[in-house]
From Swiss-Prot:
Protein species of origin: Rickettsia bellii (strain OSU 85-389)
Requisite cofactors: Mg(2+)
One Gene Ontology term of the molecular function aspect: magnesium ion binding
Domain of life: Bacteria
Annotated binding of Mg(2+), by residue: 258
Enzyme Commission code(s) on record: 6.1.1.20
Homology family: Belongs to the class-II aminoacyl-tRNA synthetase family. Phe-tRNA synthetase alpha subunit type 1 subfamily.
Subunit structure: Tetramer of two alpha and two beta subunits.
Protein's GO biological process: phenylalanyl-tRNA aminoacylation
UniProt subcellular location: Cytoplasm
Pfam families, sorted: Phe_tRNA-synt_N (PF02912), tRNA-synt_2d (PF01409)
Name this polypeptide is given: Phenylalanine--tRNA ligase alpha subunit
InterPro entries xref list: aa-tRNA-synth_II, aa-tRNA-synth_II/BPL/LPL, Phe-tRNA-synth_IIc_asu, Phe-tRNA_ligase_II_N, Phe_tRNA_ligase_alpha1_bac, Phenylalanyl-tRNA_Synthase, tRNA-bd_arm
Amino acid sequence: MDNIETILRLAEEKILLVQSLKVLQEYKVEFLGKNGIVTNELKKLGSLSEQDRKEFGLKINKLKEEIQNIIKAKEEILEEEELNLKLSSDKIDLSLPARRYKQGSIHPITQCMEELIQVFAKFGFSIEDGPNIENDFHNFTALNFEDDHPARQMHDTFYLKGQENDKPMLLRTHTSTVQIRAMKNGKPPFRFIAPGRTYRSDSDMTHTPMFHQIEGLVIDKDINMGHLKYVITEFIRCFFENSNIELRFRPSFFPFTEPSAEVDIRMSKTDKWLEVLGCGMVHPNVLKNVGIDNSQYQGFAFGLGVERFAMLKYNIKDLRQFFEGDMRWLKHYSFSSFDIPNLAGGLTK
């Protein structure tokens, strides 16, 4: 009995003075471990009578429980002290200089694309999208390209391995493919633009193998060339934010439109004419290829290069600079991520 009380007092004295969890663990082993003080006391049970063994066993179990409670209580105190110490050492020093915040910026192509979309939204155009990898039908045949058209040649188009419905696979050369898919899957009227990446085997100051296009389509009853001229004229003046800009429509040829035209602009009478886009009335064969009755519906289409419009508006001289990743160039020509294009506040800040 006296020995049990002595062990309990010894445990209380040692544990209450502990200042670290490591030392507390050592005392736990000392008293309750495999070769600990309490465990050694249990070994005395074998030398006692049955009655004394029962009484002594109860006392040892009670001793063990009390020591465990003392250790647990001390452990909670030490853990709280350790946490408070850590929190106090982790305080933010407000006198330290702040880290420089590096904010990203908007690439001029992205900015130009957003501005163009904003302008077309003014005329009620929605947005359609489609795959970059296409088959020959959507890219050429449905758009009235002849089998021997130069655009079908390997030196102009990136062909891929494999076929779809016995048609060669390729990287789309224009976003007109989106127009074909939309007309096949829907019913007129249509009024949408198709922005996206396009691919052609060409590279110089004014051409890159990958470039961005926006192509537009309007299909409805009683659509004529006057509607096309109005939309293009108002779009150009709105995008360049210049109501005095001059436009001229030159006769041209595209397989998918008839009649066809190319649009030139100049900012003032002293400037040279600059070609900016192609357009025309949708060819009846194109409507026939997508199952639209060309005796009831007509329409117009247009296509423009986003890089071309960005170069003209932001005064960029070389198309290849858009994709070279020169941080100095990007810093000069990029836009703030807070300057979201809108017609009310002005497209470009």
